[in-house]
Protein backbone atom coordinates (compact mmCIF):
# COMPACT_ATOMS: atom_id res chain seq x y z
CA UNK A 1 0.00 0.00 0.00
CA UNK A 2 1.30 3.46 -0.92
CA UNK A 3 1.24 6.13 1.75
CA UNK A 4 -0.52 9.32 0.75
CA UNK A 5 0.48 12.74 2.07
CA UNK A 6 -1.14 16.13 1.84
CA UNK A 7 0.13 19.61 2.68
CA UNK A 8 -2.88 21.42 4.11
CA UNK A 9 -0.85 23.50 6.55
CA UNK A 10 1.61 24.55 3.88
CA UNK A 11 -1.09 25.30 1.31
CA UNK A 12 -3.58 27.11 3.56
CA UNK A 13 -1.43 28.97 6.11
CA UNK A 14 1.49 30.45 4.13
CA UNK A 15 2.43 33.01 6.79
CA UNK A 16 3.03 30.38 9.47
CA UNK A 17 6.14 28.55 8.32
CA UNK A 18 9.43 28.40 6.45
CA UNK A 19 9.92 25.62 3.91
CA UNK A 20 13.19 23.73 4.37
CA UNK A 21 14.71 20.25 4.36
CA UNK A 22 15.97 18.22 7.35
CA UNK A 23 19.72 18.03 7.97
CA UNK A 24 20.76 14.37 8.38
CA UNK A 25 22.92 13.13 11.24
CA UNK A 26 26.31 11.41 11.01
CA UNK A 27 26.11 7.61 10.83
CA UNK A 28 22.39 7.69 11.62
CA UNK A 29 20.72 4.36 12.40
CA UNK A 30 17.21 3.29 13.32
CA UNK A 31 17.21 1.87 16.86
CA UNK A 32 13.48 1.55 17.58
CA UNK A 33 10.20 1.83 15.77
CA UNK A 34 6.61 1.46 16.85
CA UNK A 35 5.56 -1.74 15.11
CA UNK A 36 1.94 -1.66 16.29
CA UNK A 37 1.39 1.94 15.23
CA UNK A 38 3.13 1.29 11.91
CA UNK A 39 0.77 -1.60 11.24
CA UNK A 40 -2.28 0.51 12.10
CA UNK A 41 -1.13 3.18 9.65
CA UNK A 42 -0.28 0.63 6.94
CA UNK A 43 3.34 1.82 6.78
CA UNK A 44 5.32 -0.64 4.61
CA UNK A 45 7.78 -2.74 6.60
CA UNK A 46 10.41 -2.02 3.95
CA UNK A 47 10.68 1.56 5.20
CA UNK A 48 12.09 0.22 8.47
CA UNK A 49 14.71 -1.96 6.75
CA UNK A 50 18.04 -0.96 8.33
CA UNK A 51 19.92 -1.83 5.14
CA UNK A 52 18.32 1.25 3.58
CA UNK A 53 20.00 3.53 6.11
CA UNK A 54 18.06 5.92 8.31
CA UNK A 55 15.81 6.92 5.42
CA UNK A 56 12.87 9.17 6.18
CA UNK A 57 13.30 8.46 9.91
CA UNK A 58 16.64 10.27 9.85
CA UNK A 59 15.70 12.99 7.38
CA UNK A 60 17.81 11.44 4.63
CA UNK A 61 14.90 10.97 2.23
CA UNK A 62 11.33 12.17 1.84
CA UNK A 63 8.29 10.14 0.90
CA UNK A 64 6.24 11.19 -2.15
CA UNK A 65 3.90 14.03 -1.26
CA UNK A 66 5.89 15.33 1.71
CA UNK A 67 6.45 19.10 1.80
CA UNK A 68 8.61 19.89 4.86
CA UNK A 69 8.11 23.10 6.83
CA UNK A 70 9.20 24.55 10.16
CA UNK A 71 6.34 26.33 11.91
CA UNK A 72 6.57 29.71 13.60
CA UNK A 73 4.77 30.50 16.85
CA UNK A 74 5.34 32.53 20.00
CA UNK A 75 4.40 32.10 23.63
CA UNK A 76 4.57 32.78 27.33
CA UNK A 77 7.28 30.79 29.10
CA UNK A 78 7.12 30.51 32.89
CA UNK A 79 4.47 33.22 32.85
CA UNK A 80 6.57 35.74 30.89
CA UNK A 81 6.08 36.77 27.27
CA UNK A 82 8.97 35.20 25.35
CA UNK A 83 8.23 36.56 21.89
CA UNK A 84 8.86 34.54 18.75
CA UNK A 85 9.73 30.89 19.25
CA UNK A 86 8.84 28.28 16.62
CA UNK A 87 10.13 24.89 15.55
CA UNK A 88 13.77 25.35 16.50
CA UNK A 89 14.73 21.77 15.71
CA UNK A 90 11.58 20.13 14.39
CA UNK A 91 10.19 19.93 10.88
CA UNK A 92 6.67 19.01 9.84
CA UNK A 93 7.43 16.65 6.95
CA UNK A 94 3.84 16.23 5.83
CA UNK A 95 0.34 15.17 6.79
CA UNK A 96 -0.56 11.54 6.13
CA UNK A 97 -4.00 11.19 4.59
CA UNK A 98 -5.85 8.36 6.33
CA UNK A 99 -8.64 6.16 4.99
CA UNK A 100 -11.35 8.03 6.93
CA UNK A 101 -10.30 11.36 5.44
CA UNK A 102 -8.49 12.61 8.55
CA UNK A 103 -4.79 13.42 8.59
CA UNK A 104 -1.81 12.76 10.82
CA UNK A 105 1.19 15.08 11.10
CA UNK A 106 4.62 13.51 10.65
CA UNK A 107 6.95 15.76 12.64
CA UNK A 108 10.69 15.02 12.73
CA UNK A 109 12.25 16.27 15.95
CA UNK A 110 16.00 16.94 15.99
CA UNK A 111 16.01 17.61 12.24
CA UNK A 112 18.59 20.42 12.26
CA UNK A 113 18.75 24.20 12.25
CA UNK A 114 15.70 26.22 11.23
CA UNK A 115 15.09 29.98 11.10
CA UNK A 116 13.53 29.58 14.56
CA UNK A 117 16.47 27.85 16.29
CA UNK A 118 17.47 31.10 18.05
CA UNK A 119 20.65 30.18 20.00
CA UNK A 120 20.08 26.43 19.66
CA UNK A 121 21.77 23.89 17.42
CA UNK A 122 18.65 22.35 15.92
CA UNK A 123 19.38 18.98 17.42
CA UNK A 124 17.78 16.63 19.94
CA UNK A 125 19.79 14.15 21.97
CA UNK A 126 19.31 10.42 22.42
CA UNK A 127 18.31 10.86 26.07
CA UNK A 128 15.41 13.20 25.32
CA UNK A 129 14.14 11.29 22.29
CA UNK A 130 13.99 8.09 24.32
CA UNK A 131 12.14 9.88 27.13
CA UNK A 132 9.59 11.35 24.73
CA UNK A 133 9.03 8.07 22.92
CA UNK A 134 8.41 6.27 26.20
CA UNK A 135 6.23 8.99 27.68
CA UNK A 136 3.98 9.48 24.69
CA UNK A 137 3.38 5.75 24.31
CA UNK A 138 2.86 5.30 28.05
CA UNK A 139 0.24 8.05 28.03
CA UNK A 140 -1.48 6.58 24.99
CA UNK A 141 -1.88 3.19 26.63
CA UNK A 142 -3.15 4.89 29.79
CA UNK A 143 -5.90 6.32 27.59
CA UNK A 144 -4.74 9.95 27.80
CA UNK A 145 -4.78 12.15 24.65
CA UNK A 146 -1.23 12.54 23.41
CA UNK A 147 1.12 12.80 20.49
CA UNK A 148 2.59 9.44 19.43
CA UNK A 149 6.13 8.21 18.80
CA UNK A 150 6.84 6.28 15.60
CA UNK A 151 10.63 5.93 15.49
CA UNK A 152 13.98 6.85 17.00
CA UNK A 153 17.21 7.31 15.05
CA UNK A 154 20.55 7.45 16.89
CA UNK A 155 23.80 8.80 15.48
CA UNK A 156 27.45 9.63 16.07
CA UNK A 157 26.85 13.39 15.79
CA UNK A 158 28.19 15.07 18.96
CA UNK A 159 25.76 17.47 20.65
CA UNK A 160 26.73 19.69 23.58
CA UNK A 161 24.27 20.04 26.45
CA UNK A 162 25.31 20.02 30.14
CA UNK A 163 27.71 17.33 28.91
CA UNK A 164 28.51 16.10 25.42
CA UNK A 165 25.84 13.75 24.13
CA UNK A 166 24.90 12.32 20.74
CA UNK A 167 22.26 13.56 18.36
CA UNK A 168 19.07 11.66 17.64
CA UNK A 169 15.77 12.12 15.84
CA UNK A 170 12.23 11.25 16.86
CA UNK A 171 9.36 10.88 14.43
CA UNK A 172 6.38 12.30 16.30
CA UNK A 173 2.84 11.85 15.03
CA UNK A 174 -0.20 13.93 15.97
CA UNK A 175 -3.58 14.84 14.58
CA UNK A 176 -2.26 18.40 14.66
CA UNK A 177 0.66 20.38 16.06
CA UNK A 178 -1.42 23.56 16.34
CA UNK A 179 -0.54 25.31 19.61
CA UNK A 180 -1.86 28.18 21.68
CA UNK A 181 1.37 29.90 20.69
CA UNK A 182 0.43 29.97 17.00
CA UNK A 183 -2.43 32.33 17.85
CA UNK A 184 -0.31 34.42 20.21
CA UNK A 185 2.30 34.95 17.52
CA UNK A 186 0.01 36.81 15.15
CA UNK A 187 -1.99 38.55 17.87
CA UNK A 188 1.13 40.23 19.25
CA UNK A 189 2.24 41.07 15.72
CA UNK A 190 -1.09 42.92 15.38
CA UNK A 191 -2.29 40.67 12.58
CA UNK A 192 -5.77 39.64 13.81
CA UNK A 193 -6.79 38.45 10.34
CA UNK A 194 -4.13 35.73 10.57
CA UNK A 195 -5.35 34.74 14.03
CA UNK A 196 -8.79 34.30 12.48
CA UNK A 197 -7.28 32.27 9.62
CA UNK A 198 -5.82 29.87 12.18
CA UNK A 199 -9.22 29.51 13.84
CA UNK A 200 -10.83 28.95 10.44
CA UNK A 201 -8.27 26.25 9.65
CA UNK A 202 -8.92 24.50 12.96
CA UNK A 203 -12.70 24.59 12.51
CA UNK A 204 -12.55 23.54 8.86
CA UNK A 205 -10.41 20.48 9.52
CA UNK A 206 -11.17 19.41 13.10
CA UNK A 207 -14.69 20.76 13.79
CA UNK A 208 -16.27 20.90 10.31
CA UNK A 209 -19.77 20.58 11.80
CA UNK A 210 -19.52 24.22 12.89
CA UNK A 211 -18.29 25.79 9.65
CA UNK A 212 -21.67 27.26 8.73
CA UNK A 213 -22.82 28.09 12.27
CA UNK A 214 -23.03 31.78 13.19
CA UNK A 215 -21.39 31.25 16.58
CA UNK A 216 -18.72 28.92 15.23
CA UNK A 217 -15.77 30.71 16.84
CA UNK A 218 -17.33 30.77 20.30
CA UNK A 219 -18.34 27.11 20.02
CA UNK A 220 -14.84 26.20 18.87
CA UNK A 221 -13.09 27.97 21.74
CA UNK A 222 -15.51 26.44 24.20
CA UNK A 223 -14.53 22.99 22.94
CA UNK A 224 -10.82 23.85 23.13
CA UNK A 225 -11.36 24.86 26.76
CA UNK A 226 -13.34 21.71 27.56
CA UNK A 227 -10.73 19.45 25.97
CA UNK A 228 -8.03 21.19 27.95
CA UNK A 229 -10.01 20.68 31.15
CA UNK A 230 -10.47 16.98 30.50
CA UNK A 231 -6.79 16.58 29.66
CA UNK A 232 -5.62 18.23 32.88
CA UNK A 233 -8.06 16.10 34.86
CA UNK A 234 -6.51 12.99 33.33
CA UNK A 235 -3.01 14.20 34.22
CA UNK A 236 -4.00 14.80 37.83
CA UNK A 237 -5.67 11.42 38.25
CA UNK A 238 -2.63 9.42 37.08
CA UNK A 239 -0.12 11.64 38.90
CA UNK A 240 1.50 13.12 35.78
CA UNK A 241 3.46 16.38 36.02
CA UNK A 242 4.23 17.89 32.60
CA UNK A 243 7.00 20.12 33.89
CA UNK A 244 6.93 22.93 31.33
CA UNK A 245 3.37 24.09 30.59
CA UNK A 246 4.34 27.12 28.53
CA UNK A 247 1.65 28.37 26.16
CA UNK A 248 3.66 27.14 23.18
CA UNK A 249 3.43 23.63 24.68
CA UNK A 250 -0.38 23.66 24.81
CA UNK A 251 -2.32 21.83 22.09
CA UNK A 252 -5.47 23.24 20.50
CA UNK A 253 -6.78 19.67 20.29
CA UNK A 254 -6.20 18.92 23.96
CA UNK A 255 -3.24 16.60 23.41
CA UNK A 256 -0.29 16.10 25.71
CA UNK A 257 2.59 17.50 23.69
CA UNK A 258 6.30 18.29 24.16
CA UNK A 259 7.54 15.84 26.75
CA UNK A 260 10.54 17.38 28.46
CA UNK A 261 11.08 17.48 32.24
CA UNK A 262 7.94 15.46 32.96
CA UNK A 263 7.52 13.02 35.81
CA UNK A 264 4.96 10.68 37.31
CA UNK A 265 4.52 10.90 41.06
CA UNK A 266 6.40 8.32 43.08
CA UNK A 267 5.62 9.39 46.64
CA UNK A 268 2.38 11.36 46.80
CA UNK A 269 3.58 14.95 46.94
CA UNK A 270 1.08 17.52 45.62
CA UNK A 271 3.90 20.08 45.41
CA UNK A 272 6.07 17.83 43.23
CA UNK A 273 8.26 19.78 40.79
CA UNK A 274 9.55 17.63 37.95
CA UNK A 275 11.65 20.32 36.29
CA UNK A 276 14.73 21.33 38.28
CA UNK A 277 14.81 24.59 36.29
CA UNK A 278 11.41 25.56 37.72
CA UNK A 279 12.80 27.37 40.75
CA UNK A 280 9.51 29.05 41.67
CA UNK A 281 7.45 25.88 41.32
CA UNK A 282 5.13 27.41 38.74
CA UNK A 283 4.57 24.04 37.07
CA UNK A 284 4.39 21.92 40.19
CA UNK A 285 1.88 19.06 40.13
CA UNK A 286 -0.93 20.71 42.10
CA UNK A 287 -0.67 23.98 40.16
CA UNK A 288 -1.30 22.44 36.74
CA UNK A 289 -5.06 23.13 36.71
CA UNK A 290 -4.47 26.82 37.49
CA UNK A 291 -1.72 27.15 34.90
CA UNK A 292 -3.89 25.59 32.20
CA UNK A 293 -6.60 28.16 32.95
CA UNK A 294 -4.02 30.96 32.81
CA UNK A 295 -2.84 29.65 29.44
CA UNK A 296 -6.42 29.52 28.15
CA UNK A 297 -6.86 33.13 29.24
CA UNK A 298 -3.82 34.06 27.13
CA UNK A 299 -5.36 32.24 24.17
CA UNK A 300 -8.72 33.95 24.81
CA UNK A 301 -7.01 37.32 24.62
CA UNK A 302 -5.87 36.58 21.06
CA UNK A 303 -9.46 35.83 20.04
CA UNK A 304 -10.99 39.10 21.24
CA UNK A 305 -11.07 40.62 17.72
CA UNK A 306 -13.76 38.13 16.66
CA UNK A 307 -15.28 36.54 19.80
CA UNK A 308 -17.33 38.54 22.32
CA UNK A 309 -15.91 38.83 25.84
CA UNK A 310 -18.98 37.17 27.37
CA UNK A 311 -18.57 34.17 25.07
CA UNK A 312 -14.90 33.89 25.97
CA UNK A 313 -15.73 33.96 29.66
CA UNK A 314 -18.37 31.27 29.18
CA UNK A 315 -15.75 29.11 27.51
CA UNK A 316 -13.33 29.64 30.39
CA UNK A 317 -16.10 28.59 32.77
CA UNK A 318 -16.51 25.49 30.61
CA UNK A 319 -12.87 24.65 31.31
CA UNK A 320 -13.53 24.65 35.04
CA UNK A 321 -16.69 22.58 34.63
CA UNK A 322 -14.97 20.01 32.40
CA UNK A 323 -11.97 19.77 34.71
CA UNK A 324 -13.98 19.27 37.90
CA UNK A 325 -16.56 16.97 36.33
CA UNK A 326 -14.03 14.71 34.65
CA UNK A 327 -11.70 14.68 37.64
CA UNK A 328 -14.56 13.78 39.97
CA UNK A 329 -15.77 11.00 37.70
CA UNK A 330 -12.32 9.52 37.29
CA UNK A 331 -11.46 9.67 41.00
CA UNK A 332 -14.75 7.99 41.92
CA UNK A 333 -13.85 5.24 39.47
CA UNK A 334 -10.41 4.93 41.06
CA UNK A 335 -12.09 4.49 44.44
CA UNK A 336 -14.61 1.99 43.07
CA UNK A 337 -17.68 4.20 43.43
CA UNK A 338 -20.48 3.87 40.89
CA UNK A 339 -22.53 6.81 42.16
CA UNK A 340 -21.74 10.29 43.45
CA UNK A 341 -22.35 11.05 47.12
CA UNK A 342 -21.83 14.26 49.04
CA UNK A 343 -19.03 12.98 51.29
CA UNK A 344 -16.91 11.49 48.49
CA UNK A 345 -14.57 14.47 48.24
CA UNK A 346 -13.97 14.46 51.98
CA UNK A 347 -13.15 10.75 51.90
CA UNK A 348 -10.71 11.26 49.01
CA UNK A 349 -9.06 14.23 50.69
CA UNK A 350 -8.63 12.24 53.89
CA UNK A 351 -6.80 9.58 51.90
CA UNK A 352 -4.62 12.18 50.19
CA UNK A 353 -3.72 13.74 53.55
CA UNK A 354 -2.76 10.35 54.92
CA UNK A 355 -0.70 9.54 51.81
CA UNK A 356 1.09 12.90 51.95
CA UNK A 357 2.01 12.44 55.62
CA UNK A 358 3.32 8.95 55.00
CA UNK A 359 4.96 9.52 51.63
CA UNK A 360 2.82 6.77 50.13
CA UNK A 361 3.47 5.71 46.57
CA UNK A 362 0.68 7.23 44.47
CA UNK A 363 0.34 4.53 41.82
CA UNK A 364 0.83 1.54 44.10
CA UNK A 365 -1.61 2.84 46.73
CA UNK A 366 -4.52 3.06 44.31
CA UNK A 367 -3.60 -0.20 42.62
CA UNK A 368 -3.53 -2.03 45.95
CA UNK A 369 -6.81 -0.39 46.94
CA UNK A 370 -8.37 -1.88 43.80
CA UNK A 371 -7.95 -5.35 45.34
CA UNK A 372 -10.07 -4.44 48.39
CA UNK A 373 -12.72 -6.96 49.42
CA UNK A 374 -15.77 -5.24 50.84
CA UNK A 375 -16.38 -7.80 53.58
CA UNK A 376 -12.77 -7.90 54.75
CA UNK A 377 -11.86 -5.66 57.66
CA UNK A 378 -8.18 -5.78 56.68
CA UNK A 379 -6.31 -4.72 53.56
CA UNK A 380 -2.82 -5.46 52.24
CA UNK A 381 -2.55 -1.70 51.85
CA UNK A 382 -2.52 -1.37 55.65
CA UNK A 383 1.01 -2.74 55.87
CA UNK A 384 2.33 0.15 53.78
CA UNK A 385 1.32 2.72 56.42
CA UNK A 386 3.18 3.55 59.61
CA UNK A 387 0.16 5.15 61.28
CA UNK A 388 -2.02 2.04 61.19
CA UNK A 389 -4.68 3.61 63.42
CA UNK A 390 -5.17 6.49 60.98
CA UNK A 391 -5.38 4.09 58.07
CA UNK A 392 -7.84 1.84 59.90
CA UNK A 393 -10.10 4.81 60.64
CA UNK A 394 -10.08 5.86 57.00
CA UNK A 395 -10.56 2.28 55.77
CA UNK A 396 -13.61 1.82 57.99
CA UNK A 397 -15.18 4.90 56.41
CA UNK A 398 -14.23 3.65 52.96
CA UNK A 399 -15.79 0.21 53.48
CA UNK A 400 -18.94 1.83 54.83
CA UNK A 401 -19.11 3.92 51.65
CA UNK A 402 -18.71 0.80 49.49
CA UNK A 403 -21.60 -0.85 51.29
CA UNK A 404 -23.96 1.93 50.19
CA UNK A 405 -23.83 0.52 46.66
CA UNK A 406 -25.21 -2.83 45.56
CA UNK A 407 -22.09 -3.78 43.62
CA UNK A 408 -20.20 -7.01 44.19
CA UNK A 409 -16.44 -7.12 44.70
CA UNK A 410 -15.68 -8.63 41.30
CA UNK A 411 -17.42 -5.89 39.31
CA UNK A 412 -16.02 -3.09 41.47
CA UNK A 413 -12.47 -4.46 41.37
CA UNK A 414 -12.73 -4.83 37.61
CA UNK A 415 -13.68 -1.17 37.25
CA UNK A 416 -10.94 -0.02 39.60
CA UNK A 417 -8.28 -2.08 37.87
CA UNK A 418 -9.20 -0.51 34.53
CA UNK A 419 -8.38 2.98 35.81
CA UNK A 420 -5.69 2.36 38.45
CA UNK A 421 -2.53 1.41 36.55
CA UNK A 422 -0.05 -1.06 37.96
CA UNK A 423 2.70 0.59 35.93
CA UNK A 424 3.54 4.16 34.97
CA UNK A 425 6.68 5.52 33.37
CA UNK A 426 8.70 6.35 36.45
CA UNK A 427 11.76 8.46 35.73
CA UNK A 428 14.12 5.77 36.97
CA UNK A 429 12.71 3.25 34.49
CA UNK A 430 13.30 5.69 31.64
CA UNK A 431 16.79 6.45 32.93
CA UNK A 432 17.71 2.77 33.06
CA UNK A 433 16.73 2.39 29.40
CA UNK A 434 18.64 5.56 28.49
CA UNK A 435 21.81 4.45 30.29
CA UNK A 436 21.80 1.15 28.43
CA UNK A 437 21.04 2.78 25.07
CA UNK A 438 23.90 5.23 25.47
CA UNK A 439 26.17 2.18 25.77
CA UNK A 440 24.69 0.71 22.59
CA UNK A 441 22.30 -1.74 24.27
CA UNK A 442 18.74 -1.16 23.07
CA UNK A 443 17.20 -4.23 24.71
CA UNK A 444 15.82 -2.36 27.74
CA UNK A 445 14.34 0.37 25.53
CA UNK A 446 12.41 -2.25 23.56
CA UNK A 447 11.46 -4.18 26.70
CA UNK A 448 10.16 -1.09 28.49
CA UNK A 449 8.06 -0.10 25.50
CA UNK A 450 6.43 -3.54 25.60
CA UNK A 451 5.76 -3.28 29.34
CA UNK A 452 4.16 0.17 28.97
CA UNK A 453 1.65 -1.24 26.49
CA UNK A 454 -0.03 -3.12 29.35
CA UNK A 455 -0.20 -0.61 32.22
CA UNK A 456 -3.25 -2.21 33.85
CA UNK A 457 -1.70 -5.68 34.17
CA UNK A 458 -0.30 -6.62 37.59
CA UNK A 459 3.38 -7.53 37.65
CA UNK A 460 5.67 -8.80 40.39
CA UNK A 461 8.91 -7.44 38.90
CA UNK A 462 10.62 -4.09 39.33
CA UNK A 463 8.60 -2.36 36.60
CA UNK A 464 5.77 -2.11 39.13
CA UNK A 465 7.92 -1.43 42.18
CA UNK A 466 8.84 1.75 44.02
CA UNK A 467 12.04 3.37 42.76
CA UNK A 468 15.40 2.25 44.15
CA UNK A 469 17.36 4.79 46.18
CA UNK A 470 19.32 6.01 43.16
CA UNK A 471 16.08 6.52 41.24
CA UNK A 472 14.39 8.82 43.74
CA UNK A 473 14.16 12.50 42.84
CA UNK A 474 16.14 12.22 39.62
CA UNK A 475 16.81 15.72 38.32
CA UNK A 476 15.25 16.43 34.95
CA UNK A 477 15.61 19.69 33.05
CA UNK A 478 14.39 21.36 29.87
CA UNK A 479 17.70 20.43 28.25
CA UNK A 480 16.99 18.11 25.36
UniProtKB/Swiss-Prot annotation:
Intrachain disulfide bonds: none
Residues the entry annotates as binding ATP: 86, 88-89, 109, 121-122, 172, 179, 258
EC numbers for this chain: 2.7.7.-, 2.7.7.108
Pfam families recorded: SelO
ATP-binding is among the record's keywords: yes
Record bears the keyword Magnesium: yes
GO molecular function annotations of the record: AMPylase activity; ATP binding; magnesium ion binding
This protein's UniProt keywords: ATP-binding, Magnesium, Manganese, Metal-binding, Nucleotide-binding, Nucleotidyltransferase, Transferase
UniProt binding sites for Mg(2+): 249, 258
Cofactor: Mg(2+); Mn(2+)
Active site per UniProt: 248 (proton acceptor)
Top EC category: transferase
Domain of life: Bacteria
Family under the similarity heading: Belongs to the SELO family.
HAMAP family given in the database record: YdiU_SelO
The protein's role, per its UniProt record: Nucleotidyltransferase involved in the post-translational modification of proteins. It can catalyze the addition of adenosine monophosphate (AMP) or uridine monophosphate (UMP) to a protein, resulting in modifications known as AMPylation and UMPylation.
The protein, known as: Protein nucleotidyltransferase YdiU
Organism: Salmonella newport (strain SL254)
